[in-house]
Regions:
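Loop-centered beta-sheet repeat module
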Residues: 265-277, 283-305
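Asparagine-rich low-complexity intrinsically disordered tracts
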Residues: 2-9, 38, 58, 202, ...
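N-terminal Sec-pathway targeting helices
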Residues: 1-16, 22-23
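Membrane-interface motif at the C-terminal end of an N-terminal transmembrane signal
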Residues: 15-52
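Acidic, Gly/Ser/Thr-rich repeat motifs that build Ca2+-stabilized beta-propeller blades
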Residues: 55-262, 296-299, 303-305
Length: 305
């Protein structure tokens, strides 16, 4: 009986729809009477949202095209210093603080949010090295950096030959996680897509000799375990990635657990750990475990802490 009633209701709605479609005046009167008074405003809002999304999508595409063009070609990027300057006091020492704006690229699929990726920097002699979250390397001389307007010079790398999964270049939660320069060698930590495993990742390190024309990275350290997107709580933001110089022979790396919490407690993998890694052999030793997402890492050589 219930099934027959449902069929009858559907037939009635179909007949009404046919009648309305065949009588334009009646259709307009029907919608004018029954539609909400502010439906026009709502429609305009929806149209504006889609228009904004279209503009942002085009902007994102243009930025991505530009990124693809300059990552393999030397180019100068402008830096602008802000007018505001101030003195800050830290541990009884005064520091001169000045803000600079640097052009980087959209690295998020959430176009409406206009999320920008992170960037990392370290010093090499009299130059400041900078890398964006999506792998764009550049440098500037410190004396030039102090000027009102200056330029970053991009450096070509082989990053795109090593890191081929799309999220590295398009989503801020993936990508480069830190930069460390020791003597003439440069290290970057990043979220690595594990070969042979679909949508599975861990925190790893690339290493290269500094070269102002082209930096040729090689794989230096790869974690022994990974977490896949299929895991219910997977989150690439919880990846750690801080690198610091430890001693003459080793560096320290923090790794996250990608919210697979049990792996941080397991000493048979490298997730959710502080790891000591030999600079030459890349052999490692776990020195601390049970971490979710270590973002601050500092080693005090004076008291070995």
């Amino acid at each position: 009986m219930k099934k027959k009633n449902k069929i009858l209701i559907i037939i009635v709605f179909i007949l009404i729809a046919i009648f309305l479609l065949n009588n334009r005046t009646t259709t307009l009167s029907f919608f004018k009477y029954y539609a909400p008074q502010k439906i026009g405003e709502k429609v305009k809002e929806i149209v504006n949202i889609f228009s904004l999304y279209k503009d942002l999508k085009e902007k994102h595409l243009n930025l991505q095209i530009r990124f693809n063009n300059i990552i393999d070609n030397e180019e100068k990027l402008p830096i602008y210093s802000e007018d505001e300057e101030k003195i800050v006091k830290i541990a009884d020492k005064e520091f001169y603080l000045k803000t600079f704006s640097i052009p980087f690229f959209l690295t998020s699929k959430n176009l409406l949010a206009e999320t920008f990726g992170s960037f990392y920097m370290d010093f090499y002699k009299k130059d400041l090295f900078v890398v964006s979250g999506n792998g764009l390397f550049s440098y500037i001389n410190i004396d030039e950096f102090k000027k009102k307007e200056s330029e970053l010079i991009t450096i070509t790398t082989n990053i795109k030959k090593i890191i081929k999964y799309n999220e590295f270049y398009t989503e801020s939660r993936f990508g480069v996680k830190d930069l460390l320069i020791i003597d003439d060698e440069i290290y970057i930590s990043y979220i690595k897509s594990i070969n042979g495993e679909k949508d599975c990742f861990n925190t790893s390190i690339l290493k290269a000799k500094i070269n102002f024309k082209k930096i040729e990275f090689k794989e230096f350290f790869t974690g022994t375990s990974f977490v896949c997107k299929s895991y219910v709580d997977f989150n690439a933001h919880s990846s750690g990635g801080r690198i610091v110089n430890y001693d003459d022979d080793n560096i320290l790396l923090s790794t996250g657990e990608f919210l697979d919490r049990t792996k941080a407690q397991n000493l048979n993998n490298t997730l959710g750990k502080i790891i000591k890694i030999n600079k030459k052999s890349s052999n490692y030793e776990i020195i601390s475990f049970g971490h979710r997402n270590v973002q601050g890492l500092f080693f005090n050589k004076n008291n070995n802490t």
